[in-house]
């Protein structure tokens, strides 16, 4: 007959169950365990042959060590393998429900008290004395997988992972469990009991592990660190799940369809698509859901809870998906890119709606070009691109617009309204997209990267325009002369060469400009402002295009390549001038003598031979020059350089 050990008859609790016991219940547990130990120790000793008092002293020391070891393990350790049949303690009840903790090691029969076990033991012919296991010894080995256990109770429960035995069945829903602790925790999903309450925020939890993980949100503790990428986690399950992103492991396979999953929770939810099980039922409206996250999100419809708060603007959301979508308004992130036209979108529904235009599967189809729309308002706005209708007219200047949003933005140019303010520098903007793009000048964020050359952009429109450098696409064509342009701004400026329109007038000197950027640059000649500073050498520029061209002197970047000979240039104007050496085009013609030039700068210098203008004057001797190059050469006469 196998020996009977103290661990075989001890009543064990999980760490969660032990935490629920009150001080009086813990004291009762210690007293019962000590009495059990005395009774068990008396089986294998001949009291008549030894000094009784010595034995009592020895037994007292040993039982104290054993009971303290059990209690310490419950108070301090991370419980792993010791899970056995236990009472279901409630925090406010002082009763202690007894189970049958005394099991015969020969035949497995259970008894309520030790004396009954003693009487039963005599029915077996062989009898061995009590044997004390050394601390840490694991004498129970699983024949299936070789795993070893210190306690018979843990070993029996482990065997169920192989046999599939689930002796604990829920009366409410019929679900069965291998472990009593799992069964007790499951019962709480029906009763709604949440015994673990956070003292910081009052939130309550069904599971102790979830409660511990939640507490780390307040403390900021993240004890689990990934060796691969250094990412830290507050919860061990999150850490284990993360490790699988590196290993690619998907240990949970569906027996129905063969699909494998990285996470057990995802696997469980997937299984319900086959079984139709929906264990999470709303008490308010009776709706049942298969997924706990969907259930929690649904509950918020009734409670109005909005736990996801935006740090930028304070707006709160009930659902994490809505919150993530909102965050993109601030960051400008548009993860859904159309491969057809390059347009990017914040949300998947917006992207899908846009794709209908290309596929032609929408209910509202344009008869002119075949583009389709799922929204009637979008369809109406699109039709105006063909009809030329512009129903929204500005009362201030008479300018008309096909779209109400464009009209509202235009009105702000007259009212001066700038409702969108940068929190970093206080600069205000009339348009929300403009403030998002501006904020990136502070953060340095450039989310749009060119796959051709690796260049990154803070603004999606700049990115799309840049792509046309590689593709050569020029979608904007002038109806007057047939000239095509890559950029709408260039096209609009070109149109003004035909109309002669110069809407931007300088208040200082009255000079007018056809282009807003030229106007802003001109204003800086009066103010002396040079807002663009090179981080490499500190040189400052009044124009953003000038600093970009200058930066290329440091980086060596030459993005503009001649298609004829392959020569590359840092500046777009340089490549255009160079291309004229191949084509022979000389667009700048002198009205005085009919001489033509390929370069505007050469043309301006030539004009000075007729006008006599010499804008470069030497401060040393007063001599003047019509060309900056001649002026610099002259200066060396004085400097001796």
From Swiss-Prot:
Transcription among keywords: yes
Q: Which GO terms describe its cellular component?
A: nucleus
The record's GO molecular-function terms, alphabetically, read: DNA-binding transcription factor activity, RNA polymerase II-specific; RNA polymerase II transcription regulatory region sequence-specific DNA binding; zinc ion binding
Indicate where this protein is primarily found: nucleus
Signal peptide residues on this chain, from the entry's feature table = none
Q: Where are the zinc fingers (C2H2-type)?
A: 102-124, 140-162, 168-190, 196-218, 224-246, 252-274, 280-302, 308-330, 336-358, 364-386, 392-414, 420-442, 448-470, 476-498, 504-526, 532-554, 560-582, 588-610, 616-638
Q: Which SMART domains match?
A: KRAB, ZnF_C2H2
Q: Where is the KRAB domain?
A: 4-75
This protein's source sits in the domain of life called Eukaryota
SUPFAM superfamilies in the cross-refs: beta-beta-alpha zinc fingers (SSF57667), KRAB domain (Kruppel-associated box) (SSF109640)
Presence of keyword DNA-binding: yes
**Where can this protein be found?**
Nucleus
Gene Ontology terms describing biological process: regulation of transcription by RNA polymerase II
Instruction: Keywords in alphabetical order, please.
Output: DNA-binding, Metal-binding, Nucleus, Repeat, Transcription, Transcription regulation, Zinc, Zinc-finger
Q: Which PANTHER family match?
A: TRANSCRIPTIONAL REPRESSOR PROTEIN YY, ZINC FINGER PROTEIN 143
Q: What does this protein do?
A: May be involved in transcriptional regulation.
The record's similarity note reads: Belongs to the krueppel C2H2-type zinc-finger protein family.
UniProt name for this protein: Zinc finger protein 709
User: What species was this sequence derived from?
Assistant: Homo sapiens
Phylogenetic placement of the source organism: Eukaryota, Metazoa, Chordata, Craniata, Vertebrata
């Amino acid at each position: 007959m196998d020996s009977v050990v103290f661990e075989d008859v001890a009543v064990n609790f999980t760490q969660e169950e032990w935490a629920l016991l009150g001080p009086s219940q813990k004291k009762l547990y210690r007293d019962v365990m000590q009495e059990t130990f005395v009774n068990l120790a008396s089986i294998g000793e001949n009291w008549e042959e030894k000094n009784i008092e010595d034995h009592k002293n020895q037994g007292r020391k040993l039982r104290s060590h054993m009971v303290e070891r059990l209690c310490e393990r419950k108070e301090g350790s991370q419980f792993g393998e010791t899970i056995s049949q236990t009472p279901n303690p409630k925090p406010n009840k002082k009763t202690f429900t007894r189970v049958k903790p005394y099991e015969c090691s020969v035949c497995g029969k259970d008894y309520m008290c030790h004396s009954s076990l003693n009487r039963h033991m005599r029915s077996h012919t062989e009898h061995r004395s009590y044997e004390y296991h050394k601390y840490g010894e694991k004498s129970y080995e699983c024949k299936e997988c070789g795993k070893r256990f210190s306690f018979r109770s843990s070993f029996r429960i482990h065997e169920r992972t192989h046999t599939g035995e689930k002796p604990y069945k829920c009366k409410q829903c019929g679900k069965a469990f291998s472990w009593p602790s799992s069964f007790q925790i499951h019962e709480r999903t029906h009763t709604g009991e949440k015994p673990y309450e956070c003292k910081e925020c009052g939130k309550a939890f069904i599971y102790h592990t979830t409660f511990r993980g939640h507490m780390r949100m307040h403390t900021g503790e993240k004890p689990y660190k990934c060796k691969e990428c250094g990412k830290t986690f507050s919860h061990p399950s999150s850490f284990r799940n993360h490790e699988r992103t590196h290993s690619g492991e998907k240990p949970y396979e569906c027996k129905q369809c063969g699909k494998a999953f990285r996470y057990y929770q995802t696997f469980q939810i997937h299984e319900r698509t086959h079984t139709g099980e929906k264990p999470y039922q709303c008490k308010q409206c009776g709706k049942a859901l298969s997924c706990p996250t969907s259930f929690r999100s649904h509950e918020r419809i009734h409670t109005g809870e909005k736990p996801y708060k935006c740090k930028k603007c304070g707006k709160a959301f009930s659902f994490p998906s809505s919150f993530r979508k909102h965050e993109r308004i601030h960051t400008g992130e548009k993860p859904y890119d159309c491969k057809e036209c390059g347009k990017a979108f914040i949300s998947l529904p917006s992207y899908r709606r846009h794709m209908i235009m290309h596929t032609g599967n929408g209910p509202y189809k344009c008869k002119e070009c075949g583009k389709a729309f799922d929204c009637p308002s979008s369809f109406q706005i699109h039709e105006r691109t063909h009809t030329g209708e512009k129903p929204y007219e500005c009362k201030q200047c008479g300018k008309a617009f096909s779209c109400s949003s464009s009209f509202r933005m235009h009105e702000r140019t007259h009212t001066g309204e700038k409702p969108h303010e940068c929190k970093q520098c206080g600069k205000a903007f009339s348009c929300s997209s403009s403030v998002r793009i501006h904020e990136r000048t502070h953060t340095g964020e450039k989310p749009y990267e060119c796959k051709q050359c690796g260049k990154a952009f803070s603004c999606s429109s700049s990115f799309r325009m840049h792509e046309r450098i590689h593709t050569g696409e020029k979608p904007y064509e002038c109806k007057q002369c047939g000239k095509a342009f890559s950029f709408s701004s260039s096209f609009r400026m070109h149109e003004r060469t035909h109309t002669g329109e110069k809407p931007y007038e300088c208040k200082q000197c009255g000079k007018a400009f056809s282009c807003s950027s030229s106007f802003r640059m001109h204003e800086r000649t009066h103010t002396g402002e040079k807002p663009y500073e090179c981080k490499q050498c500190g040189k400052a520029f009044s124009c953003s295009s000038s600093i970009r061209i200058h930066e290329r002197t440091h980086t060596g970047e030459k993005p503009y390549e001649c298609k004829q000979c392959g020569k590359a240039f840092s500046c777009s104007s340089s490549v255009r001038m160079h291309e004229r050496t191949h084509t022979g085009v000389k667009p700048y013609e002198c009205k005085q003598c009919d001489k033509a030039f390929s370069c505007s700068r050469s043309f301006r210098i030539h004009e000075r031979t007729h006008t006599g203008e010499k804008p470069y004057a030497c401060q040393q001797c007063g001599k003047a020059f019509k060309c900056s190059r001649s002026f610099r050469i002259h200066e060396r006469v004085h400097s001796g350089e």
